[in-house]
Amino acid sequence: MFEYPQGYKLIAGVDEVGRGPLVGAVVTAAVILDPHNPIEGLADSKKLSEKKRLALADEIKEKALAWALGRAEADEIDEINILQASLLAMTRAVKSLKIQPHFVLVDGNKIPKDLDIPAQAVVKGDSIVAEISAASILAKVARDQEMEELDKQYPEYAFAKHKGYPTKLHLEKLAELGALPQHRRSFAPVKKALEQF
């Protein structure tokens, strides 16, 4: 059972989505929930159906005291690596909140630097901390929508299906069609495709 840090009124949860994909930004969200307006059914976004995620995302946006998205683009990921880019995007999400939290709970085992707010990393936080679950849902919905937009631009890559993850289909398309400007050049399968073309 997770124990919340004592003596802090406004607690934000932060999570990222999109460390593994070969394309696009890593997207993060920060959420401060309203203790007087609870949301039923919050869970790790990966364990929810798309329909449930979308419904919960709307409810979170409506009921949360504050929420914000952050991101780090593919070229930033290539420049500073995916871990540093994820942490940078988390800081951006927290700094974009319209209400600044007193404490931040971060999914995983690392705390972003430059937060300037007391923080704690929570391993598997997206499953055990409501604020982090809410953040994971908002980040996942936002990133999936971006992949659906990219799919409209480049339907031959089937981004709506694999969401940019290195599935067999995506790797086949990469080998056949080459990399797009949105692909992460520092990731091995993309590097390989760039060498072939």
Swiss-Prot record:
<keyword id="KW-0963">Cytoplasm</keyword>
<dbReference type="InterPro" id="IPR001352">
    <property type="entry name" value="RNase_HII/HIII"/>
</dbReference>
<feature type="binding site">
    <location>
        <position position="107"/>
    </location>
    <ligand>
        <name>a divalent metal cation</name>
    </ligand>
</feature>
<keyword id="KW-0479">Metal-binding</keyword>
<dbReference type="GO" id="GO:0005737">
    <property type="term" value="C:cytoplasm"/>
</dbReference>
<protein>
    <recommendedName>
        <fullName>Ribonuclease HII</fullName>
        <ecNumber>3.1.26.4</ecNumber>
    </recommendedName>
</protein>
<dbReference type="InterPro" id="IPR022898">
    <property type="entry name" value="RNase_HII"/>
</dbReference>
<dbReference type="GO" id="GO:0003723">
    <property type="term" value="F:RNA binding"/>
</dbReference>
<feature type="binding site">
    <location>
        <position position="15"/>
    </location>
    <ligand>
        <name>a divalent metal cation</name>
    </ligand>
</feature>
<dbReference type="InterPro" id="IPR012337">
    <property type="entry name" value="RNaseH-like_sf"/>
</dbReference>
<dbReference type="GO" id="GO:0032299">
    <property type="term" value="C:ribonuclease H2 complex"/>
</dbReference>
<keyword id="KW-0378">Hydrolase</keyword>
<keyword id="KW-0255">Endonuclease</keyword>
<comment type="function">
    <text>Endonuclease that specifically degrades the RNA of RNA-DNA hybrids.</text>
</comment>
<dbReference type="GO" id="GO:0030145">
    <property type="term" value="F:manganese ion binding"/>
</dbReference>
<feature type="domain" description="RNase H type-2">
    <location>
        <begin position="9"/>
        <end position="197"/>
    </location>
</feature>
<keyword id="KW-0464">Manganese</keyword>
<dbReference type="InterPro" id="IPR036397">
    <property type="entry name" value="RNaseH_sf"/>
</dbReference>
<dbReference type="InterPro" id="IPR024567">
    <property type="entry name" value="RNase_HII/HIII_dom"/>
</dbReference>
<comment type="similarity">
    <text>Belongs to the RNase HII family.</text>
</comment>
<keyword id="KW-0540">Nuclease</keyword>
<dbReference type="GO" id="GO:0006298">
    <property type="term" value="P:mismatch repair"/>
</dbReference>
<dbReference type="GO" id="GO:0004523">
    <property type="term" value="F:RNA-DNA hybrid ribonuclease activity"/>
</dbReference>
<feature type="binding site">
    <location>
        <position position="16"/>
    </location>
    <ligand>
        <name>a divalent metal cation</name>
    </ligand>
</feature>
<dbReference type="GO" id="GO:0043137">
    <property type="term" value="P:DNA replication, removal of RNA primer"/>
</dbReference>
<dbReference type="Pfam" id="PF01351">
    <property type="entry name" value="RNase_HII"/>
</dbReference>
